[in-house]
UniProtKB/Swiss-Prot annotation:
Membrane-spanning parts: 11-31, 67-87, 114-134, 172-191, 208-228, 277-297
Task performed by this protein: Mitochondrial tricarboxylate transporter; part of the gene cluster that mediates the biosynthesis of itaconic acid and 2-hydroxyparaconate. Cis-aconitate is secreted by the mitochondrial tricarboxylate transporter MTT1. In the cytosol cis-aconitate is converted into trans-aconitate via isomerization by the aconitate-delta-isomerase ADI1. Decarboxylation of trans-aconitate by the trans-aconitate decarboxylase TAD1 then leads then to the production of itaconic acid.
Disruption phenotype: Decreases the production of itaconic acid.
One annotated GO biological process: transmembrane transport
Lineage: superkingdom: Eukaryota
Protein name stated in the entry: Mitochondrial tricarboxylate transporter 1
InterPro entries: Mit_carrier, Mitochondrial_sb/sol_carrier, Mt_carrier_dom_sf, TXTP-like
GO cellular component: mitochondrial membrane
Keyword terms of this UniProt record: Membrane, Mitochondrion, Repeat, Transmembrane, Transmembrane helix, Transport
Family listed: Belongs to the mitochondrial carrier (TC 2.A.29) family.
Intervals holding Solcar repeats: 8-98, 107-197, 209-294
Topological relation to the membrane, as annotated: Multi-pass membrane protein
Main localization, broad class: mitochondrion
Lineage: Eukaryota, Fungi, Dikarya, Basidiomycota, Ustilaginomycotina
Length: 300
């Protein structure tokens, strides 16, 4: 069974996934903004590193840019979220079909997690890296005294490509693949395991569960994914920032961060990210299931 607890066509999984991703992107962007800004390694006028709390980030952003500042880079994330969720659910359902036991038609828990990892790797390459690089650069740029890029998704992306080439929107691909592959394995694997277990635990003959249960297990799977993949997320953000050239590689970024800021820096932004993924997990799986129901009809 796919995440919706039923077999759905590839076209339905893509549309349902893309719709869920777009809704989730809008609903959680302010929290994502706080997480991203808190992961930068900002410096004061003397070159000393500063640490900003989420409250300080909100206050500073509202003072300088108003409420719209909390949505800087939102369009890039919504477009990227729609694309990556469409790829994720399409790939996940296809990988699950490929990994099913040929004789029993069932899927083991390990195969569930492997399917999630495969889906995460594909979405990282085709959707997540470019969209998150653009989002990160636009947010980072908006905080600088002299912005380098034009505002807005289209003009901002054009500025990045013009100045840095296509490689400019594929920075940090290694940590993105590491983060997305492991996060999707944990998130989709955990959700599917709970999704399959819940109806059985209640003695239900149907795979249908109510929206509150869907939201709850989606949120729970998001929290588990956060703390299992947070270091990858911090490295990804730093490798995609405007001053990422100071890192020779992902390994250099890791060792430099540990040397100058300590291991705690690898979990910076974890509170903001866990807040986002609690909402994200609940929203994306709930919307996905509802869109599947609308497009494919009630379960027979």
């Amino acid at each position: 069974m796919p995440p919706s607890g039923r077999k759905v066509s590839p076209s339905v999984s893509v549309v349902a996934g893309a719709t869920a991703g777009a809704v989730e992107g809008v609903a959680t962007f302010p929290i994502e903004y706080l997480k991203t800004v808190s992961q930068f390694a900002p410096r004061d006028v003397h070159g000393n590193q500063q640490r900003l709390s989420p409250i300080e980030v909100v206050r500073s952003t509202l003072q300088k840019e108003g409420p719209k500042g909390l949505f800087r880079g939102c369009t890039a994330m919504v477009v990227g979220n729609a694309g990556k969720a469409g790829v994720r659910f399409f790939a996940f359902e296809n990988f699950r079909s490929m990994l099913k036991n040929k004789s029993t038609g069932k899927l083991s828990n390990s195969s569930n997690y492997l399917a999630g990892m495969g889906a995460g790797t594909l979405e990282a390459i085709f959707a997540v890296t470019p969209s998150e690089t653009i989002k990160t650069k636009l947010i980072d740029d908006s905080k600088r005294a002299k912005p380098r890029y034009e505002q807005g998704l289209v003009r901002g992306t054009a500025s990045i490509v013009r100045q840095e080439g296509l490689a400019g929107i594929y920075q940090g691909v290694v940590p993105v693949v590491m983060r997305q592959g492991s996060a999707s394995a944990i998130r989709l694997g955990t959700y599917s395991a709970l999704r399959d277990w819940l109806p059985k635990a209640h003695g239900s003959g149907s795979s249908l569960i109510n929206w509150l249960a869907t939201f709850s297990i989606g949120a729970a799977s998001g929290v588990v994914a956060v703390y299992g993949t947070m270091p990858f997320d911090v490295l990804k953000t730093r490798m995609q920032a405007i001053d990422a050239a100071r890192y020779r590689s992902t390994w250099h970024c890791l060792t430099n961060t540990l040397k100058t800021e300590g291991a705690a820096a690898l979990w910076r932004g974890s509170v903001s990210r866990s807040m986002r993924l609690i909402v994200s997990g609940g929203v994306i799986f709930s919307v996905y299931e509802q869109v599947v129901w609308l497009l494919a009809g009630p379960e027979s």
